């Protein structure tokens, strides 16, 4: 089976590197994701296709761990899934952080609706509290597959050895792949926000307008 791993070159890069601290803050998730990719390719972590994910959870006893930020999960989520965000909104309003937030808003936030985030320092702790048995089967998922790769790397380092990774994240999920969905949006659209969200809505509505005008 060919495993489609998310490409790291789609991550937004800043046009100007302001200082070492700023550069390091954007590099950390990428390093973790590379480690997660190696775990997938080595077979230490199971790659699960969206079509088989529900069966893996229902029949094989996997716990579905959603690592998306809270605002993405509010839009759409799988009923009964465990939620521990890998990234949380950065509350710091210091000068350097405010500058980074402005850059983020101009290059990423307005278009995608993504907020300026930081690594959740309590991520591993919260997962261990919720799933203390490290022999448990855990299927890790995010919106597009990259953040869940970083989460897989962290959890493997914590001693979890029966990990799964949903290939491509919820973005690749089709209607019916998970029978019980909560929220106001489709799972595959929950990551999209900002201007992109409204353009997507327009594209979805255009075929309907075309049929009515005939």
Swiss-Prot record:
Location within or outside the cell: Membrane
Active site, UniProt feature: 142
Segments forming a coiled coil: none
SUPFAM superfamilies, per the entry: Rhodanese/Cell cycle control phosphatase (SSF52821)
Keyword DNA-binding annotated: no
PROSITE patterns in the record: RHODANESE_3
Primary residence: membrane
Rhodanese domain boundaries: 58-182
Lipid bilayer topology: Single-pass membrane protein
Transmembrane segments: 190-206
Protein name (Swiss-Prot/TrEMBL): Rhodanese-like domain-containing protein 10
